Amino acid sequence: MTYIETLNWIHSHKANGRRPSLERMRYLLNLLDNPQDKFPAVHVVGTNGKGSTTSFLQHILTASSYKTGTFTSPFITRFNERIAIDGKEISDSNLVKTAQAIKPIVDSNVFQEKVGKVTEFELVTALMFCYFATINPIDVAVIEAGIGG
């Protein structure tokens, strides 16, 4: 897959009336060997200030010599901004590599028959967990709530 093909694949998972599902996420993450359990995380929630708080925490942790992953939404100019390590967005090649690692599971008929097609938000969340756990392992993540603040 190319970078553009990867973005098109991600964006092809629009919710179209489907709601994000904790059951679907648990099932997917279990099939991916629970990457979310491979590192500690701070979950930033609330009505206002999530982006600023995420940025402050990332800078503090990085300055303290922790390899710090951040997950934010929405992106401002480039999709890759959503997933970053120590303030540097995921590279095009690492986004492709991470997507290729989970695509066979996400696109399998067995998966979709069991829990349905993932939403774009679920897919991007799974990409982030896999990237931080296996492709470019981190010490800690700062994860901004993307739905329901």
Regions found by a protein language model. Name each.
Residues 48-50, 75-76:
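Short active-site-proximal "capping" loops at secondary-structure junctions
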Residues 46-49, 144:
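Conserved phosphate-binding and hydrolysis motifs of nucleotide-dependent enzymes
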Residues 29, 34-37, 63-149:
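ATP-dependent carboxylate-amine ligase catalytic core
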Residues 20-23, 52, 90-93, 97:
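Conserved active-site and cofactor/substrate-binding residues in soluble primary-metabolism enzymes
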Residues 1-46, 53-66, 71, 110-116:
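Short functional linear segments
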